């Protein structure tokens, strides 16, 4: 028949590969199994960074700026935050931010003050911890007037009371808010 088209060959089925390599025929050696690479010894801890402010009477420790966002950190007692702010003010530092951290498992709140110095290109943090049940510490608004709204915001979100602050009325939350949304036990 002249008008018939030849049948198309059916496509070849893809070869299936066994999931597990076949065992070597008896009498032949199996291919060697590669050994895992030797464990690389852990790098030694980084050298501590020098204190960039050795002349300032605060317990600063130099830290890695790329990891922490500051060049040095100091932890002080709550009663010493105003004194720390005064020392940094005398050195020409400006206040950048104030924030809180809720360490619920430890029953503590932390307040972190970030300062910067334009001429020295330095950023430092001062930290303090207070009991979570009654979180109070002195206000630094007398030293840094711009701390006024930072402290109000931290009070709004964490419930931390800054003693001596002229007005801790809600800053960002509704006026009738009785909650602090950044505390870890907050539920909406």
Enumerate the language-model features and the residues they cover.
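Terminal low-complexity/charged segments
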Residues: 1-188
């Amino acid at each position: 028949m002249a008008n018939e088209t030849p049948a198309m060959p059916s496509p070849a089925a893809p070869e299936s590969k066994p999931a597990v390599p076949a065992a070597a025929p008896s009498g032949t050696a199996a291919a060697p199994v590669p050994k895992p690479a030797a464990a690389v010894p852990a790098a030694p801890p980084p050298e501590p960074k020098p204190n960039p402010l050795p002349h300032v009477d605060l317990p600063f420790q130099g830290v890695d700026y790329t990891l922490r966002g500051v060049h040095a950190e100091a932890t002080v007692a709550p009663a010493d935050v105003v004194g720390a702010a005064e020392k940094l003010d005398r050195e020409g530092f400006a206040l950048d931010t104030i924030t809180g951290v809720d360490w619920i498992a430890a029953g503590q709140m932390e307040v972190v003050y970030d300062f910067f110095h334009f001429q020295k290109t330095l950023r430092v943090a001062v930290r303090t911890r207070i009991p979570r049940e009654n979180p109070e510490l002195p206000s630094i608004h007398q030293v840094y007037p711009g701390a006024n709204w930072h402290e109000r915001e931290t009070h709004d979100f964490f419930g931390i009371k800054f003693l001596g602050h002229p007005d801790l009325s809600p800053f960002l939350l509704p006026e009738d808010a009785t909650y602090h949304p950044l505390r870890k036990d907050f539920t909406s």
